[in-house]
């Protein structure tokens, strides 16, 4: 059988106490707050935001500089052996990006007899044994001397894969 025992518990009453307003203020002043760390967190967050903005700006500058480059495709969309465009004009110092558009191996060689006087063809040409084999592979060059430059793809020159760039 279960037995129940009863115990008397006294609960104190606080109804007769008076509060002191000065004590409240001093108690509030002693409460530690985390506001001393907030500026540090804000600075870290601001630096993080600044870093993200800086990276985005740098990426935009890189993309913009690539957008200003002239692109010449090595191989036509229909599979033809051609530079597209085969003739172009650029400003001195402007970047020309030759991009393999097909799966055929191509290169870019400037004809030493068909470039402005004083320009070294070996410094602006790909070595004839080097090839851009896969679609999307690129070769970039900047031509500084004004004049007309004729170029060709050494494996496909006999098939008419030649081009010309005029530097103004």
UniProtKB/Swiss-Prot annotation:
Membrane disposition? Peripheral membrane protein
- Domain (Plastocyanin-like) ranges: 70-168
Q: Which InterPro entries does the annotation name?
A: BlueCu_1, BlueCu_1_BS, Copper_blue_Plastocyanin, Cupredoxin, Plastocyanin
Disulphide connectivity of cysteines: none
The cofactors required by this protein are: Cu(2+)
Tell me the superkingdom of the source: Eukaryota
Pfam families tied to this protein: Copper-bind (PF00127)
Q: Where in the cell is it found?
A: Plastid, Chloroplast thylakoid membrane
For the ligand (Cu cation), the binding residues are 106, 153, 156, 161
GO terms (molecular function) for this protein are:
copper ion binding; electron transporter, transferring electrons from cytochrome b6/f complex of photosystem II activity
Provide the primary localization.
Answer: plastid
Gene Ontology cellular-component terms for this entry are: chloroplast thylakoid lumen; chloroplast thylakoid membrane
- What are the boundaries of the transit peptide? 1-69
Q: Which keywords does this chain's UniProt record carry? A: Chloroplast, Copper, Electron transport, Membrane, Metal-binding, Plastid, Thylakoid, Transit peptide, Transport
Function of this protein?
Participates in electron transfer between P700 and the cytochrome b6-f complex in photosystem I.
Family as reported in the entry's similarity comment = Belongs to the plastocyanin family.
Q: By its UniProt entry, which PANTHER family does this protein fall under?
A: PLASTOCYANIN MAJOR ISOFORM, CHLOROPLASTIC-RELATED (PTHR34192:SF10)
Q: What is this protein called?
A: Plastocyanin, chloroplastic
The record lists the organism as: Pisum sativum
- What lineage is this protein's organism placed in? Eukaryota, Viridiplantae, Streptophyta, Embryophyta, Tracheophyta
């Amino acid at each position: 059988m279960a037995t129940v025992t009863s115990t008397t518990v006294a609960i104190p009453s606080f109804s007769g106490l008076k509060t002191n307003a000065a004590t409240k203020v001093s108690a509030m002043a002693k409460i530690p707050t985390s506001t001393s760390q907030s500026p540090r967190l804000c600075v870290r967050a601001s630096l993080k935001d600044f870093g993200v903005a800086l990276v985005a700006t740098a990426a935009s500058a890189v993309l913009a500089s690539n957008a200003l480059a002239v692109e010449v495709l090595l191989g036509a969309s229909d599979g033809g052996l051609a530079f597209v465009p085969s003739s172009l004009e650029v400003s001195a110092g402007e970047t020309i990006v030759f991009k393999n558009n097909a799966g055929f191996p191509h290169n870019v060689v400037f004809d030493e007899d068909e470039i402005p006087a004083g320009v070294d063809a070996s410094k602006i040409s790909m070595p004839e044994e080097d090839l851009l084999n896969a679609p999307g592979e690129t070769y970039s060059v900047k031509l500084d001397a004004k004049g007309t430059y004729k170029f060709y793809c050494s494996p496909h020159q006999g098939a008419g894969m030649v081009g010309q760039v005029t530097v103004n």
